[in-house]
C-alpha cells in the first residue's frame, strides 16, 4: 500500500510517467560520454623518437633509416651517433651502440589527429600518467557516489541532479581548455564525480516513477540509454578529431538538460519521506491530470496514510528489536560467521571482477587492432542484447545460473583471444565482443543476486560496500590495460582468467530465485548452509542436535536459541 498503491491509481506507468521517465533516461547519455571519452582523449598512437636531423617529419621512415637510427623493438631512445649524410646512406658503419633518450617525439597521425598523450608527450617514462588520469576519473566516480548520494537524500533529487549537471558542464569545458596535465586530470576527476551525481539520482528517480512490478524493466532501460551514449561517443570522435574540441563537444549537450529544472518534478517519495505531504500530493495530482485520471486529494491522502502507518509500524518493530538485541547489526557482522563470511567474500569477488573487466574491456578497444571506432561501437552495441537477455530471463531462470554462465562465457571468450593467431583479427574482435556481452549481463545480474544474498538488517550497507569494491576495481582497470605495453594480449589474459575463476566460484553461492528475502543475520548465516539436520534427513537417520547458540541480529531475545534444522 502507500505510495506504490497510489501510483497504480494514478495510471500506473501512464503517459506522464513515460515522458518523465524518458527525459530522465536521456541524462544517462552524457554520463556515458564522459566515462568513455578517455579512450579518445588519451589515445596513444604509434610513435618514435624525433631524430636530430628531422624537422617536422612524418612518422613513416624507410626501413634502412629505421634500422640505422633505433635499436630493435625500442621506441624511447635512438643511437647516439653523428647522423651524417654518409652514415644515413650506409657509406660508413655505426660508430657506437650507445643510445640517447628521446627529447621529442614523432606520432603516427593516421588514426588520431592529436590527443592529450601527443600534446603532453605521455609516452615512455611518462606513459603511466595517462592510466593515472583515467584512474583518478574513477576515483571521482567513487567520491561522487558517496557525496551526491547523501546530498540527494538530504536536499532532494531535483536540486542535486541540476547541480551535478551544472558542475559537469563547467569542469567538462575546463578539461577541454586545460593548459597542462594536472589541470586536465583534476577537471576530469570532478567530471567523474558529477557522473555519479547525475546517474545515481536519475536512476533513483526513474525507479521511483514506476510501481514495484515494473522496476526491473525501468532499471534495465536506464542502462540501455547508457549504452546508446556509449555508441554515440564514437560518432563524436568520428567527426571531431582534435581532443580538446572533442571534450567540449561531449560536454555541451549537458546544457540541454538545464531546462529540466522547470520540467522534472521532485520525487514524491522523497517529499513524503521529508513530511512534505501536500507537495507530494500536488505532484501526484499533476500526473493524474496528465494521465486523464480523476482522484481526490482525500483519496490520495488516505492511500498515503495507510502506507505511512505500515512503514511506521515496521520501523517501530525494528527499533524495538534493536533495543532488545543491543547495537544494530553492521557490515562487519557479515564477517563474524563462517557461512556469511564465505558468501560475502564471494560476492565481493564477483563485484570486483565484473566491474574491473567491464571497464577494462570498454577502454581496451584500441588494443584490439583494426578500426578503433568500429570496435568501440560494437563494444557498446553488444550491451543492448545483453540487457534484453536479462529482461527475458532474470525472473525465469536462477540468478546463480545466469551469473555463473555469463562469467564463464566471458572468461572463455577472452581467453580465446589469446590463443587465436593474430592474423585472424576478425575472430579476435568477435571473441572479445562476446566477452563484453557476457560481462555486461553479469553486471546486470550481480546487483540483484547480491541484494537477495544479504539480510535486510545489513542489506543497504552491504550493497554499499560491494559497490565500493566495484569502484576500486574500476580505478584499477586503466592500469590493467596499461599492461598491454608489456605484452599486448596480457590484459585480456588476466581479464579472462579472473572472470572464469569468479564464474566457477559463484557456484558456491546458494540460489536465491523464488526464495524468501532474508531478514536477520541468523537467516543469512543459515541460508545456503547444509546443516546436520539436512544430512540426517537425507540419510533417514534420527537427529539429536545439541542446542544452538544465538546469533547476533537473529530476532530472538537474549538467552534464547535458534533451531539448527528440523526438530
From Swiss-Prot:
Glycosylation sites: 55, 67, 89, 97
Main location as per UniProt: membrane
Domain of life: Eukaryota
Region listing for Disordered, in residue ranges: 304-326, 546-567
InterPro entries associated with the record: MFS_dom, MFS_sugar_transport-like, MFS_trans_sf
GO BP annotation list: monoatomic ion transport; organic cation transport; positive regulation of cell growth; positive regulation of multicellular organism growth
Functional note: Probably transports organic cations.
Protein name: Organic cation transporter-like protein
Gene: Orct2
Amino acid at each position: 500500500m502507500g505510495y506504490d498503491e497510489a501510483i497504480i491509481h494514478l495510471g500506473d506507468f501512464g503517459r506522464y510517467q513515460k515522458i518523465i521517465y524518458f527525459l530522465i533516461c536521456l541524462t544517462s547519455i552524457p554520463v556515458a560520454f564522459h566515462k568513455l571519452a578517455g579512450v579518445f582523449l588519451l589515445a596513444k598512437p604509434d610513435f618514435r623518437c624525433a631524430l636530430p636531423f628531422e624537422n617536422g617529419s612524418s612518422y613513416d621512415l624507410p626501413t634502412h633509416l629505421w634500422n640505422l637510427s633505433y635499436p630493435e623493438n625500442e621506441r624511447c631512445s635512438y643511437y647516439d651517433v653523428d647522423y651524417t649524410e654518409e652514415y644515413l646512406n650506409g657509406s660508413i658503419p655505426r660508430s657506437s651502440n650507445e643510445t640517447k633518450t628521446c627529447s621529442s617525439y614523432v606520432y603516427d597521425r593516421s588514426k588520431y589527429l592529436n590527443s592529450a598523450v601527443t600534446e603532453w608527450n605521455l609516452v615512455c617514462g611518462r606513459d603511466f600518467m595517462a592510466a593515472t588520469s583515467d584512474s583518478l576519473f574513477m576515483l571521482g566516480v567513487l567520491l561522487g557516489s558517496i557525496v551526491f548520494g547523501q546530498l540527494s537524500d538530504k536536499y532532494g533529487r531535483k536540486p542535486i541532479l541540476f547541480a551535478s549537471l551544472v558542475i559537469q558542464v563547467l569542469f567538462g569545458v575546463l578539461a577541454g581548455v586545460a593548459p597542462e596535465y594536472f589541470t586536465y586530470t583534476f577537471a576530469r576527476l570532478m567530471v567523474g564525480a558529477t557522473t555519479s551525481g547525475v546517474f545515481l539520482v536519475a536512476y533513483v528517480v526513474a525507479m521511483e516513477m514506476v510501481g514495484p512490478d515494473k522496476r526491473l524493466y525501468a532499471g534495465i532501460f536506464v542502462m540501455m540509454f547508457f549504452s546508446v551514449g556509449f555508441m554515440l561517443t564514437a560518432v563524436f570522435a568520428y567527426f571531431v578529431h582534435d581532443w580538446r574540441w572533442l571534450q567540449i563537444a561531449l560536454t555541451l549537450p549537458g546544457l540541454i538538460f538545464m531546462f529540466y529544472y522547470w520540467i522534472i518534478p521532485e520525487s514524491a517519495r522523497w517529499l513524503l519521506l521529508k513530511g512534505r505531504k501536500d507537495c507530494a500530493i500536488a505532484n501526484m495530482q499533476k500526473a493524474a491530470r496528465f494521465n486523464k485520471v480523476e482522484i481526490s486529494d482525500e483519496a490520495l491522502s488516505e492511500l498515503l496514510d495507510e502506507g505511512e502507518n505500515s512503514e511506521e509500524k515496521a520501523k517501530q518493530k525494528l527499533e524495538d528489536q534493536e533495543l532488545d538485541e543491543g547495537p544494530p547489526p553492521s557490515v562487519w557482522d557479515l564477517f563474524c560467521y563462517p557461512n556469511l563470511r564465505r558468501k560475502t567474500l564471494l560476492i565481493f569477488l564477483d563485484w570486483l571482477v565484473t566491474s574491473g573487466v567491464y571497464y577494462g574491456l570498454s577502454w581496451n578497444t584500441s588494443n584490439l587492432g583494426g578500426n578503433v571506432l568500429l570496435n568501440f561501437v560494437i563494444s557498446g552495441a553488444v550491451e543492448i542484447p545483453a540487457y534484453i537477455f536479462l529482461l527475458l530471463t532474470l525472473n525465469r531462470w536462477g540468478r546463480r545460473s545466469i551469473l555463473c554462465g555469463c562469467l564463464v562465457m566471458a572468461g572463455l571468450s577472452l581467453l580465446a583471444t589469446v590463443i587465436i593467431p593474430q592474423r585472424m583479427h576478425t575472430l579476435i574482435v568477435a571473441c572479445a565482443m562476446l566477452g563484453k556481452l557476457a560481462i555486461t549481463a553479469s553486471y546486470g545480474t550481480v546487483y540483484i543476486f547480491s541484494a537477495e544474498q544479504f539480510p535486510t538488517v545489513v542489506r543497504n550497507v552491504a550493497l554499499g560496500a560491494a559497490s565500493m569494491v566495484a569502484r576500486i576495481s574500476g580505478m584499477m582497470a586503466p592500469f590493467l590495460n596499461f599492461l598491454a605495453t608489456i605484452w599486448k594480449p596480457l590484459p585480456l589474459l588476466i581479464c579472462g582468467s579472473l572472470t572464469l575463476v569468479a564464474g566457477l566460484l559463484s557456484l558456491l553461492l546458494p540460489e536465491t530465485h523464488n526464495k524468501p528475502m532474508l531478514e536477520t543475520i541468523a537467516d543469512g548465516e543459515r541460508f545456503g548452509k547444509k546443516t546436520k539436520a539436512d544430512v540426517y534427513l537425507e540419510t533417514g537417520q534420527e537427529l539429536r542436535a545439541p542446542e544452538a547458540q544465538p546469533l547476533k541480529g537473529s530476532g530472538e531475545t537474549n538467552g534464547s536459541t535458534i533451531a539448527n534444522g528440523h526438530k
